[in-house]
Amino acid sequence: MPREEFPGEPTGHPGRHLPDDATASTATPASGRSPTAAPASGRPRIIALDVLRGFTLCEILFANIQLIADHGTAVVTQPMGDWDPWLGLPIFSLLFGIGFTLLLDSAADRVSRPRLVLLRRLVALLAIGLVHVVLWPGEILTRYAVVGLLVLLPSSWLPRWAVAGLAAVLVPVALWGGGGPLLIAGLFLLGSALARYGVADQIERSIRGPLLLGLVLTAGAATALWAHGQMEAGADPMQPSFTSSLADLLIAGVVVCALLVLLRTPLRPVLRVVFAPLGRMALTNYLTATLLVLAATHVLGLPIGQSLQVAFLAAGAILAAQWLLSALWLRRYRQGPLEWLWRWATWARRPPSSRVGT
């Protein structure tokens, strides 16, 4: 399954209005806004989530550019052999669950029916995905929207301990079955649970937690890779095993922890400049990347589907152009053009101007 995903729009702080979240309310006081307040957020963005989204968006394009170019029919050569190193699915699925819960909590401050806001958001995402799938059959927006409607939205009525418990069951079951929509559902729920327990609010404040967790995940990934090597003889190379899927998931966790640690070092400004603009305009960049890849293939005639070297050079050029345009756009506007339209559909009213300074 192609590893490409798009997360939600995480801003603000979680946990005040969802079931069984009373303990989280002390971390962030109620805003006191009227339920009819305009859908404009005054809460600060969580920069780490923007950086993670931007980093994973880059990985997505490198992982899928040959498939996009050949309409999903290319035989993609993995740079590291039979082991598939692409990590977009677990990272972005986790971010989608976090972003969904943060936005639901934000909506609860502003409207009397916050889940209706999220329902509109997911339906709009489904509509976008159904258009996008014509260009790129392997796109993930439709699956994210469907799993969100069937699993993530109903889970908002559950207490956070139940959401965490469901995630703890679904993720290993999905790994045993080779991934797919069940893994997306499990990671959505895991992200939602992390947000509702306040973890998303703390990731900017601590280096010890991500560092220790990263070391544990590294040990687990090394063990899973060793076990996969022991079991590889006689196994079907086209069928992912539990150990290889587990290793993918744990390595994705290591990457997340490593980025969170680096964001607490002098490299933070560099990471923010490089990845945050891409992450803040993730939907716009995700969709326009498909158009640019198809144009490079069918208009310019680049052999992206036949040459891994050409594919990676093209991906790098596309990301560089998107970074430049994103950085320039965000100097004048608070969000990307498609993000603004998605917000319009989410709140069922025209958002206020997204110009900086208005």
Label each region the model flagged.
Residues 2-358:
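Alpha-helical transmembrane segments and their immediate juxtamembrane cytosolic regions
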